[in-house]
């Protein structure tokens, strides 16, 4: 299999996946929405801004400026933008995509204005295009450095999921498939909010007991919301939910966890965002999850508490006190 792939989004994650595709021998072009960033990648053959550990791109990976002008060249489009830019990117693709082209998304989150799943946004805007989601426990730097990684490809079309699986998989990068695109998206989005909570707990030196409790009860919250939205129960114990939650809550490669850690250390939201100096998906996703939980009458104490710290100026210490002293209940 030798394909031509366009990658839209040149952050660390988009670049890591572009590298993985190039390692497989595909011909890959990557685009950043910032012209000066594209200029840097074209001139130096790397992504010094977001993935400086990779000194040189393979020959099969190059930056591209005006991707719209050469869209007919590509077999598939990989969207790896922040969730805030996903809808705009899909609208741009609608105007120029050809019938044989399909979309793979590596973006985690919900639509920022409607709180819809990103797959729903893509299906509404470009209804006859196949859509697959690549998600799971995967830090960009480790993928780029060819460390063993396992992820999930979710699509309503199992044949397109299998196609995408083969597109990416090699001895360092293993893809599983699922048709539960709802559960895969809910897990990948909500875990970013919970990672902020885990970071707050770490910043306040709460220890590993609290960390274990947060992950376990956080998984229960993901499951409750996911089932309400139509997910399969088996998905929550897999890579896209439990796996991604464990990774993102437990390691400081996670921007969401680092952001929460700085909050737990007493920094303001503005100071914490500035210190991370990159997109913190969980910060905006917290609004969407909070609104969805209210709409569907799902009780999500950890998510609600994190939302209140982020948007209602609640002190993290008060958040913890409220969580620990609320009404006692059965675990299930």
UniProtKB/Swiss-Prot annotation:
Q: What reaction does this enzyme carry out catalytically? A: sn-glycerol 3-phosphate + NAD(+) = dihydroxyacetone phosphate + NADH + H(+); sn-glycerol 3-phosphate + NADP(+) = dihydroxyacetone phosphate + NADPH + H(+)
Indicate which residues the UniProt annotation says bind NADPH. 13, 34, 108, 140, 255, 279, 281
Q: Which residues catalyse the reaction?
A: 191
Query: EC?
Result: 1.1.1.94
Q: What class of enzyme is it?
A: oxidoreductase
Pfam families named among the record's database cross-references: NAD_Gly3P_dh_C, NAD_Gly3P_dh_N
* Classification via PROSITE patterns: NAD_G3PDH
Q: Which domain of life is it from?
A: Bacteria
Main subcellular localisation: cytoplasm
Q: Where does sn-glycerol 3-phosphate bind?
A: 108, 136, 138, 191, 244, 254-256
Please name the Gene3D superfamilies in this protein's record: N-(1-d-carboxylethyl)-l-norvaline Dehydrogenase, domain 2 (1.10.1040.10), NAD(P)-binding Rossmann-like Domain (3.40.50.720)
Q: Which GO terms describe its molecular function?
A: glycerol-3-phosphate dehydrogenase [NAD(P)+] activity; NAD binding
Q: Name one GO biological process term.
A: glycerol-3-phosphate catabolic process
CC terms in the record's Gene Ontology section: cytosol
Could you tell me where this protein is found in the cell? Cytoplasm
Per the record, the pathway is: Membrane lipid metabolism; glycerophospholipid metabolism
Cite the entry's keywords alphabetically. Cytoplasm, Lipid biosynthesis, Lipid metabolism, NAD, NADP, Nucleotide-binding, Oxidoreductase, Phospholipid biosynthesis, Phospholipid metabolism
Q: What does this protein do?
A: Catalyzes the reduction of the glycolytic intermediate dihydroxyacetone phosphate (DHAP) to sn-glycerol 3-phosphate (G3P), the key precursor for phospholipid synthesis.
**Which protein family is it in?**
Belongs to the NAD-dependent glycerol-3-phosphate dehydrogenase family.
Protein name as annotated: Glycerol-3-phosphate dehydrogenase [NAD(P)+]
To which species is this protein native? Answer: Francisella philomiragia subsp. philomiragia (strain ATCC 25017 / CCUG 19701 / FSC 153 / O#319-036)
Give the gene that encodes this protein: gpsA
